Amino acid sequence: MLTVDTARIAAPVDRVFRAAEAVERWPELLSHYRWVRMLERRPDGGVVEMAAWRPFGPVGYPTWWVSEMRVDRGAPAVYYRHVRGITTGMDVVWRLEPEGNGTTVTIVHEWSGPRWPVVGGITASWVIGPVFVHGIASRTLAGIKRAVERGESA
């Protein structure tokens, strides 16, 4: 499964990067995030528990996962490796590229799917990736864009 979400944000890369790495603030900025907890802090990131709603019309489906998060200020990029939850084994990278007077952010999710015999890969490619991963990532990116462009981010 591969999902890619991209947005251009009218703000300098350092400001966008601060919002991307300040995951504990996301529930304040992003209404679909139920909570974010830093379970273990490390100099370059840590272990983070995240929970979000995936809306389906008026109904929200609860999602939850734990990731090892690594921040690379030099790249600039933020990397995640899902270590608990249905998406265990998923690799995620947020890449930030300066572009003119703004920043292009690309979020890439890669995953071979849950360890379910026969249907794991199909479920990842047809349901989990396009419906859940893209559904949450696209909302996260749009919310970060709104917050940064309004000056509300970290």
Residue ranges of predicted features:
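Hydrophobic ligand-binding cavity/cleft-lining segments
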Residues: 1-45, 154
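Intrinsic-disorder/low-complexity, polar/charged segments enriched in Ser/Thr/Lys/Arg/Asp/Glu/Gln
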Residues: 1-8, 45-47, 64-66, 77, ...
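Hydrophobic/aromatic beta-strand elements that line small-molecule binding cavities or substrate pockets
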Residues: 5-7, 36-38, 64-71, 82, ...
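Hydrophobic beta-strand positions in extracellular immunoglobulin-like domains
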Residues: 9, 52, 109-111
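Short loop segments at secondary-structure junctions
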Residues: 10-13, 73-75, 99-101
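Hydrophobic pocket/interface hotspot
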Residues: 16-20, 26, 69, 105-107, ...
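Glycine-rich portal/gate segments that line the openings of hydrophobic small-molecule binding cavities
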Residues: 38-86, 138-154
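Beta-strand/loop substructures that line and gate deep hydrophobic ligand-binding cavities in soluble
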Residues: 81-138, 144
